[in-house]
Swiss-Prot record:
One of its GO terms (biological process) is L-histidine biosynthetic process. CDD domains: AAT_like. Its cofactor is pyridoxal 5'-phosphate. NCBIfam families: hisC (TIGR01141). The keyword Transcription does not apply. It is an enzyme of class 2 (transferase). The keyword Membrane does not apply. This is Histidinol-phosphate aminotransferase. Keywords: Amino-acid biosynthesis, Aminotransferase, Histidine biosynthesis, Pyridoxal phosphate, Transferase. It comes from Thermoanaerobacter sp. (strain X514).
Length: 351
């Protein structure tokens, strides 16, 4: 009986898979190897006390918005805070997408663009990346001209390929589009280039960011959107009243006010460089350039490598069954210790 009541868009749906496999080193979800900054840990009792968990959190996350606005160089009214950037993607769909509307996004890219498009009943137009995983801007523009998508996603840098789309190409796509263009900058801190400064020039632009990656707050679920007020007012209409809990708001605020980010970013960038160099020395391994905290690597037998790493307690993300990513594993750049263990494990398997 229940099956007959389920929405057509949900029938045949598969859960987004999150691995719960025992591991020694978790290098599959692009998380930071760093814990909370020491000064935050020292004050954790005070933070918990001040969070007043017996009352509902600030529904507007005003203090956090102010700090994020300072970080981004905008005003607080240009900031919307969500329970992870995933929630914001969902809210964008709720606010703007009717059943049958067209949504375009790069392929391969972040899986949730497709997931939330399906839930919304949208018509999906995946735009293939080039063979080297760079953006095919001409194809995007052709799709926009032909299908007039109501929503276009650009992941920059792109997950899981690590490739980027240049600013002038983003602007070309925005100018061609009559719909909303969402530029997902989840990995911005590892890249350094942004389109945030263009939000007031283009009223159809939304920039997504997260504190899950560079800031190391994946467990708190704090994402944010940067856009003009005319767009954000509609996201506020469809969000739940208390979507960010008190502890997440306060800890995120404290972490944003620390000065550890630059040092931690530099550490990851150096480890990324070293990891790419070392893996590139192994015969039969193709390593793709990356502007993120992960690297995409192709193997002749990805399943053999994946299982071999798993047996050694290393969990990486297997994309080898995804169309366009045959033979590919995505590896998070982690601590020096974890990266060394990975390098040695791959050498044992392939040399």
């Amino acid at each position: 009986m229940i099956e007959n009541l389920v929405r057509e868009e949900i029938k045949g749906f598969k859960n987004y898979e999150v691995h719960s496999i025992p591991y020694r080193y978790k290098m599959d979800a692009n998380e930071t190897p760093f814990e909370l900054p020491e000064e935050v840990i020292k004050n954790i009792q005070e933070i918990v006390k001040s969070s007043q968990v017996n009352v509902y959190p600030d529904p507007t996350a005003e203090k956090l918005k102010e700090e994020l606005a300072r970080y981004c160089g905008v005003v607080p009214t240009n900031i919307f805070v969500g329970n992870g950037s995933d929630e914001i993607i969902h809210l964008i769909m709720l606010a703007f997408i009717n059943k049958g509307d067209v949504v375009a996004y790069p392929h391969p890219s972040f899986a949730m663009y497709s997931v939330y498009s399906k839930i919304a009943g949208a018509v999906e137009i995946p735009v293939r990346l080039r063979e080297d995983y760079n953006y095919d801007v001409d194809s995007f523009i052709k799709v926009i001209e032909k299908y007039q998508p109501k929503l276009v996603f650009l992941c920059n840098p792109n997950n899981p390929t690590g490739s980027v789309i240049e600013r002038e190409d983003i602007i070309k796509i925005i100018q061609k589009s009559n719909g909303i263009v969402v530029v997902d900058e989840a990995y911005f801190e590892f890249y350094g280039n942004t389109i945030v400064d263009a939000i007031n020039e283009f009223e159809n632009l939304i920039v997504l960011r997260t504190l899950s990656k560079a800031f190391g707050l994946a467990g708190l679920r704090v994402g944010y959107a940067v856009a003009n007020e005319n767009i954000l007012k509609y996201l506020n209409l469809v969000k739940s009243p208390y979507n960010i809990n008190s502890l997440s708001q306060i800890i995120a605020l404290k972490v944003l006010r620390t000065d550890v980010l630059k040092e931690r970013i530099n550490y990851i960038l150096e480890e990324r460089k070293r990891l790419i160099k070392e893996l590139g020395k192994i015969p039969g391994v193709k390593v793709y350039p990356s502007k993120t905290n992960f690297i995409l690597v192709k193997f002749k037998d990805a399943d053999y490598v994946y299982q071999g790493l798993l047996e050694r307690g290393i969990l990486v993300r297997d994309f080898s069954k995804v169309e366009g990513l045959e033979g590919a594993l995505r590896i998070t750049v982690s601590s020096c210790e974890a990266n060394d263990y990975l390098i040695n494990g791959l050498k044992e398997l392939l040399l």
